[in-house]
């Protein structure tokens, strides 16, 4: 794709279908202040995925001085033209990246503490606290950060992950090791991520002896208890598939995660960090 800039973008009104990814909407909003006439974006299509990410975009724009108007009922977002102001920020850690590390304590027992977990945040990854509690963990804030203590077993879960789809691979890995079935719903948009994550998770977990059935927007995961066995867990160049395979490999012997280096996209030294927690 070749883009030839003309020095300024007029802006105005545009209608898009962002039902496959909220990033289309967020990207347009972020450049709204620099447009001559600002921008008004109307979503027309299926249900918007990952709404918390859109809310984060709006909050960040406002922090920098942008004027943003949101009409939820009309599915319309407007950003006025204008200069942004510089502000000092503390960049929060990406909470979704903590999912495999928190999962480790649930699978192996013991506890894991994640330092610098914000007590107040707009990140959808913060929902891990509630999700993993429902799956049997004890989660609490301490002076050192967020501490998760594994329970006696991992419980299955029936949950809509529409707004937190990036957590699905780790939740699916835990569900494959749970003591009861799980139903992960509202995640059709994951078919258009780095790979078709629903198809990939189904194929790879089943390839290790699991029992995952795939629907258009859901995964049904029925634990097979001791039937899981070793094998190659393919990643499809997808960092979250790689970490899901690593979680299963904690308790299933001889699991080889193919191309673990793909985790460099978000966790430059995932193998080193992972190994340090297993010693």
Model-predicted segments: where are they?
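Short, structured segments at the rim of ligand-binding sites
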Residues: 1-279
């Amino acid at each position: 794709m070749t883009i030839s800039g003309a020095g300024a973008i007029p802006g105005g009104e545009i209608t898009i279908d962002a039902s496959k990814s909220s990033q289309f909407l967020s990207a347009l909003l972020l450049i709204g202040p620099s447009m001559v006439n600002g921008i008004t974006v109307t979503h027309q299509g299926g249900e918007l995925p990952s709404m918390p990410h859109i809310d984060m975009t709006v909050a960040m724009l406002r922090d920098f001085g942008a004027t943003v108007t949101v009409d939820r009922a009309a599915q319309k977002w407007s950003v006025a033209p204008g200069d942004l102001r510089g502000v000092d920020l503390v960049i929060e850690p990406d909470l979704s990246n903590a999912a495999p590390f928190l999962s480790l304590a649930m699978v192996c027992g013991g506890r894991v503490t994640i330092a610098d977990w914000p007590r107040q945040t707009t990140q959808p990854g913060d929902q891990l606290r509630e999700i993993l509690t429902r799956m049997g963990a004890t989660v609490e804030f301490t002076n050192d950060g967020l501490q998760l203590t594994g329970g006696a077993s991992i419980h299955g879960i029936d949950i809509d992950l529409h707004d937190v789809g990036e957590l699905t691979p780790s939740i699916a890995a835990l569900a494959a090791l749970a003591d009861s079935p799980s139903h992960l719903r509202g995640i059709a948009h994951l078919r258009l991520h780095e790979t078709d994550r629903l198809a990939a998770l189904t194929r790879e977990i089943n390839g290790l002896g699991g029992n995952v059935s795939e629907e258009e927007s859901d995964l049904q995961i029925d634990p097979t208890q001791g039937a899981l066995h070793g094998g190659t867990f393919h990643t499809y160049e997808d960092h979250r598939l790689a970490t899901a395979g690593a979680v299963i490999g904690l308790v299933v012997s001889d699991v080889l995660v193919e191309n673990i280096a793909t985790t460099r996209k978000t966790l430059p030294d995932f193998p080193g960090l992972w190994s340090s927690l297993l010693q």
